[in-house]
UniProtKB/Swiss-Prot annotation:
Modified residues (N-acetylalanine): 2
Role of this protein: Endoplasmic reticulum (ER)-anchored protein that mediates the formation of contact sites between the ER and endosomes via interaction with FFAT motif-containing proteins such as STARD3 or WDR44. STARD3-VAPA interaction enables cholesterol transfer from the ER to endosomes. Via interaction with WDR44 participates in neosynthesized protein export. In addition, recruited to the plasma membrane through OSBPL3 binding. The OSBPL3-VAPA complex stimulates RRAS signaling which in turn attenuates integrin beta-1 (ITGB1) activation at the cell surface. With OSBPL3, may regulate ER morphology.
Residue ranges of coiled coil: 168-207
Protein name in UniProt: Vesicle-associated membrane protein-associated protein A
Amino acid sequence: MASASGAMAKHEQILVLDPPSDLKFKGPFTDVVTTNLKLQNPSDRKVCFKVKTTAPRRYCVRPNSGVIDPGSIVTVSVMLQPFDYDPNEKSKHKFMVQTIFAPPNISDMEAVWKEAKPDELMDSKLRCVFEMPNENDKLNDMEPSKAVPLNASKQDGPLPKPHSVSLNDTETRKLMEECKRLQGEMMKLSEENRHLRDEGLRLRKVAHSDKPGSTSAVSFRDNVTSPLPSLLVVIAAIFIGFFLGKFIL
């Protein structure tokens, strides 16, 4: 009986697993959460592997089987599907990595596993651990720039007081007078523009009666109506410059 039990004893796992025992999934679990499992083959022989789980509907494993060459590493991605987190589930799900030394000729992987003897199989079990981020992790994930103003204020001292932009009575009175003056100039220009417009209409009437002079009349109309926008721009620039000068000084 002892010899029979010894013959049925399984070999120790040839692969080196990283992580060796726990697959940790960090929440929140409202989206797919992925963790990686590295399988290293330190031997001088090819090793076939496959990954199994007790909850196949909850996980997607890529690749879930394959062959690892001597001295090579294969990274297996284990993707946990979204679900409503329940702390009581944290230790229920398990994974198993099953391995076997590859035969000389590998033509059908399914046949390799079907024909494998129990004492040729090697396996390792891992449990799933669900972790929810705590408040400290949330603070560490915040952008560093959000914490900079606090440190900067301590090093640089109190912030300088903003410049006052209020105007005293004398400056206000000057601004009002300047506004009235500019309004008067605007009224004058408006009157001149009306006069020029009337003159243009008169010239157009003359042009209709005298066709040879139509070109010069139209040209004159364009010339007499153009000064107003230029003058308005100049006055607006003076007005804005005056205000900016008052606020800055």
